[in-house]
Amino acid sequence: MPALLERPKLSNAMARALHRHIMMERERKRQEEEEVDKMMEQKMKEEQERRKKKEMEERMSLEETKEQILKLEEKLLALQEEKHQLFLQLKKVLHEEEKRRRKEQSDLTTLTSAAYQQSLTVHTGTHLLSMQGSPGGHNRPGTLMAADRAKQMFGPQVLTTRHYVGSAAAFAGTPEHGQFQGSPGGAYGTAQPPPHYGPTQPAYSPSQQLRAPSAFPAVQYLSQPQPQPYAVHGHFQPTQTGFLQPGGALSLQKQMEHANQQTGFSDSSSLRPMHPQALHPAPGLLASPQLPVQMQPAGKSGFAATSQPGPRLPFIQHSQNPRFYHK
């Protein structure tokens, strides 16, 4: 037979502790239920608000929607107009930049062409200046410079003398007459070598010789009857060898003036260099106002002692390549 087991009787302290524990558990459960209820209520409220908003949107009329569309279209048109204005401004700026660039390029082209034409004109003028004065054109070497042409084209006012380092004697004739000694059998011509000037060496080259305008060519001359004619073939012997001193310029100028007065030539008839081909009888080489060069025999053509002054000797030194001068 089963035995009956009796539980032990709880004490008062144990009973109070058990009661307190049960009450705390109940309170905790109640709080949890309250929190869950609050969350549910909040969700319900949010859902209700969404529903109300949706209902309000659905209740909006068609006119209100049209008004909103018109406002948005106006705003779009304003933005498009601003875009068009900005595009036009950009196009205008680009067009002005293109015009300015073309203008600068045109100015640069004009300046370049003007500079080219000026240089071409200067080059052509220099070439014509080098060719002028010789009928042969390109056959004559262009060694005649502008300074020599200026000296030959002007009168005795531009007669210049060069001071040379040499002997102290002055190579010049008397102011009245040149010193010539007649010699029928002499060989005084263009092929005669120049006389010797002593042991001193000349300090100048043939290109630096004294060139003064004279009315006489270096070979044959237009002779006029003189009281005491001399033959062309004569030895030219200076009384004293040497070079021009600075003081001999006055006597040289007097001799030139005296020679021009004796032969009938004026100072205005300054001579310019002429190419040797001008003596050939080719047509068109000599113009009508030019002086003809008469080739006369040595026995008949003569001139006075004043017809050729002393300073003509530098022209005789060009024996290999004589230069003729004409009006």
Curated annotation (Swiss-Prot):
> Where are stretches of biased composition, namely Polar residues?
253-271, 317-327
Q: What is the effect of changing K71R?
A: Abolishes sumoylation
Name the Pfam families on file: G_path_suppress
Q: Which UniProt keywords apply?
A: Activator, Coiled coil, Cytoplasm, Host-virus interaction, Isopeptide bond, Methylation, Mitochondrion, Nucleus, Repressor, Transcription, Transcription regulation, Tumor suppressor, Ubl conjugation
Q: Which residues form a coiled coil?
A: 14-109
Tissue specificity remark: Widely expressed.
What induces or represses its expression, per the UniProt entry?
Answer: Down-regulated in liposarcoma. Down-regulated in macrophages of patients with adipose tissue inflammation and type-2 diabetes.
- Name by which UniProt lists this protein: G protein pathway suppressor 2
